[in-house]
């Protein structure tokens, strides 16, 4: 079975050869193995070092099908996240993935406790990556990362971001170019994604 780390290593090994090609409404995008691996390392480092994502914590991608969704999903798996997407399983009150709809179910369940304690322990909240930082899902998440889907966007280009919302495209650029933690991925739900893809 290929886990997120083996995908990352394969991308590094591809070097300048094409690794990801995307055709969308904004044209054609092609990333080399080196560039894709660089994105994954930066996303992983950002989630671990700046957002403080914990092993197995829910990372919900409230994004349409897009090449940036692919990179953030793989970067999240490298960071050890339980990655879910629009219309997929969602974080529960414990912050870990169960059936549901986005971050809302987990956050709403925790609101009954003033300190966020759930099921006898401190619950890690959902981290949300979204192209709609003013959405209902964004209101329910603890950490909201606004992602501009423009092909060359280096920062959020939409309306001013609400207080506390991170500009994911801009902030991730300060993270290391190489993967610093090669063990974090072990806590991810990569096996579930692999099983779904093979059906």
Predicted regions and their residues:
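Extreme N-terminal leader/targeting regions
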Residues: 1-18, 28-30, 44, 48-53, ...
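Long terminal accessory regions outside catalytic cores
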Residues: 1-2, 24-26, 35, 68
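Residue-level marker for well-ordered alpha-helical positions
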Residues: 5, 41, 67-70
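AMP-dependent adenylate-forming
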Residues: 8-31, 170-199
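Short hydrophobic beta-strand segments
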Residues: 19-21, 55-65, 128-130, 199
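Conserved N-terminal alpha-helix of the aminotransferase class I/II PLP-enzyme fold
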Residues: 21, 35-46
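Conserved AMP-binding/adenylate-forming
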Residues: 46-86, 108-110
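Conserved ATP-dependent adenylate/AMP-binding module captured primarily in the ANL superfamily
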Residues: 73, 83-139, 150-166, 171
């Amino acid at each position: 079975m290929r886990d997120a780390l083996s995908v990352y290593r394969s991308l590094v090994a591809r070097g300048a050869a094409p690794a990801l090609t995307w055709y969308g409404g904004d044209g054609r995008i092609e990333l080399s193995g080196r560039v894709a691996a660089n994105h994954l390392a930066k996303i992983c480092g950002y989630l671990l070092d700046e957002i403080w994502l914990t092993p197995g914590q829910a990372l919900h991608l409230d994004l349409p099908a897009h090449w940036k969704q692919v990179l953030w999903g793989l970067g999240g798996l490298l960071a050890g996240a339980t990655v879910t997407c629009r219309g997929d399983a969602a974080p529960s009150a414990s912050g870990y993935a169960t059936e549901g709809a986005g971050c809302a179910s987990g956050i709403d369940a925790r609101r009954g406790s003033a300190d966020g304690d759930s099921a006898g322990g401190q619950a890690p909240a959902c981290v949300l990556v979204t192209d709609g930082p003013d959405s209902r899902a964004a209101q329910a998440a603890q950490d909201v990362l606004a992602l501009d889907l423009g092909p060359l966007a280096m920062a959020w280009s939409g309306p001013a971001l609400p207080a506390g919302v991170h500009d994911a495209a801009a902030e991730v650029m300060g993270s290391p170019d190489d993967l610093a933690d090669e063990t974090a991925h072990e806590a991810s739900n990569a096996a579930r994604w692999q099983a779904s893809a093979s059906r």
